[in-house]
Amino acid sequence: MGETLGDSPIDPESDSFTDTLSANISQEMTMVDTEMPFWPTNFGISSVDLSVMEDHSHSFDIKPFTTVDFSSISTPHYEDIPFTRTDPVVADYKYDLKLQEYQSAIKVEPASPPYYSEKTQLYNKPHEEPSNSLMAIECRVCGDKASGFHYGVHACEGCKGFFRRTIRLKLIYDRCDLNCRIHKKSRNKCQYCRFQKCLAVGMSHNAIRFGRMPQAEKEKLLAEISSDIDQLNPESADLRALAKHLYDSYIKSFPLTKAKARAILTGKTTDKSPFVIYDMNSLMMGEDKIKFKHITPLQEQSKEVAIRIFQGCQFRSVEAVQEITEYAKSIPGFVNLDLNDQVTLLKYGVHEIIYTMLASLMNKDGVLISEGQGFMTREFLKSLRKPFGDFMEPKFEFAVKFNALELDDSDLAIFIAVIILSGDRPGLLNVKPIEDIQDNLLQALELQLKLNHPESSQLFAKLLQKMTDLRQIVTEHVQLLQVIKKTETDMSLHPLLQEIYKDLY
């Protein structure tokens, strides 16, 4: 979860984000030299050396896109703001009492990590009973939605009950020679023909097996469906191969996946539960208990909490840019685009992807921090003084709606690739090859959702609508940064982020 994705740091002599990113892409190098915990590591309880962010001469003085001088950044002096620390024994007792109120806050629906089955060429979830979201198998008798594997075949509840009653009560129906068609709406009209259909498809009292579809049966049916799709559309095999490639790259590029985050939130992991931060005292306790990869100087620890949280977000954003850049390079065709277009696509896409993946770490009550070691409550973040208390609320509102789509990591891998390859970004030089790549990605995404969520016929359209929502969130975020620029004169924005936000919406 904390693997390093690159060994080449940002060149302090680099003139700009453009130069840095261009060199990064063309030389297959990463943008910052640091270990890669996933968003939002150190969020709110930063132990990062953030001195690079503190130069007053750079305080929201956003220079032209090609003129940031990294070598000019120095460490300013900040007046210490002492914290009053609660007695450890009293604090622990109060924390234990308060923690009980928040235990339910970090419970969400489980989501196991998807895996790729060579047999089926599809993404499935191991060690779980298949849910409705995985498969929509028809009843072999009437064509209604099967509820599971009953009496040796896949059958709906109605036909299962009909067959059981017929066998147990030894019912004999009046003979019918019309060979009536049995379907969902007509199945109750002719009991004789319905029973004959049950026998014809293989239902037997010697094969009494209730419950949901076994994994082996599901894989067999998935393989049959996949084969049928390939026969109808040979391109689907290529699209599924693309989906697998993107998923593999996604797993390598992003250390904390949605599946891992959900396992932490639901207690489905061998690691200890995350430390809950819900007020100032628990925040200070968390700083003592949570292990950080970066050590914050003592003078940084005395700063106002809201500022430290904001700066922790900045540091993590810079790391996230590296992860996203690494992933973008794995998208087939991306590195062959015009180098300036690659930079433009990342400039406009990185924050939309950050907020997409941040949703995986959230539920309606809070967000995982520091690689899942901590859980910071939504109410605590909202309680920070304005304008800092307004930063995360739109992200929570988006996350609740986005998580309702029940996407897994294999879905997200394609979706974020679609976001990156958006041909309508301002300033692109050669749009057609970008649109060609995105069109292929959209086809892969549509097929992926049909196979992975067959019961959600509108999911593809709903997901594309989220792209519009993400742009609005980024726009509002930039506007909030402008407010901070005016009200927080001693605050600074990381130079890399300055250039990304420059002329952004």
From Swiss-Prot:
Record region (Interaction with FAM120B): 205-280
CDD domains in alphabetical order: NR_DBD_Ppar (cd06965), NR_LBD_PPAR (cd06932)
InterPro entries from the UniProt entry: 1Cnucl_rcpt (IPR003074), NHR-like_dom_sf (IPR035500), Nucl_hrmn_rcpt_lig-bd (IPR000536), Nuclear_hormone_rcpt_NR1 (IPR050234), Nuclear_hrmn_rcpt (IPR001723), PPAR-gamma (IPR003077), PPARgamma_N (IPR022590), Znf_hrmn_rcpt (IPR001628)
A GO CC term attached to the entry: chromatin
Taxonomic superkingdom: Eukaryota
Keyword Metal-binding set for record: yes
Carbohydrate-modified residues: T84
Zinc finger (NR C4-type) in chain: 139-159, 176-198
Subcellular locations according to the entry: Nucleus; Cytoplasm
Modification(s) after translation: O-GlcNAcylation at Thr-84 reduces transcriptional activity in adipocytes. Phosphorylated in basal conditions and dephosphorylated when treated with the ligand. May be dephosphorylated by PPP5C. The phosphorylated form may be inactive and dephosphorylation at Ser-112 induces adipogenic activity.
Function: Nuclear receptor that binds peroxisome proliferators such as hypolipidemic drugs and fatty acids. Once activated by a ligand, the nuclear receptor binds to DNA specific PPAR response elements (PPRE) and modulates the transcription of its target genes, such as acyl-CoA oxidase. It therefore controls the peroxisomal beta-oxidation pathway of fatty acids. Key regulator of adipocyte differentiation and glucose homeostasis. ARF6 acts as a key regulator of the tissue-specific adipocyte P2 (aP2) enhancer.
Record's disease association: Defects in PPARG can lead to type 2 insulin-resistant diabetes and hyptertension. PPARG mutations may be associated with colon cancer.
UniProt comment concerning the protein's domains: The 9aaTAD motif is a transactivation domain present in a large number of yeast and animal transcription factors.
Subunit structure, as described in the record: Interacts with FOXO1 (acetylated form). Heterodimer with other nuclear receptors, such as RXRA. The heterodimer with the retinoic acid receptor RXRA is called adipocyte-specific transcription factor ARF6. Interacts with NCOA6 coactivator, leading to a strong increase in transcription of target genes. Interacts with coactivator PPARBP, leading to a mild increase in transcription of target genes. Interacts with NOCA7 in a ligand-inducible manner. Interacts with NCOA1 and NCOA2 LXXLL motifs. Interacts with ASXL1, ASXL2, DNTTIP2, FAM120B, MAP2K1/MEK1, NR0B2, PDPK1, PRDM16, PRMT2 and TGFB1I1.
Protein name per UniProt: Peroxisome proliferator-activated receptor gamma
Gene coding for it: PPARG
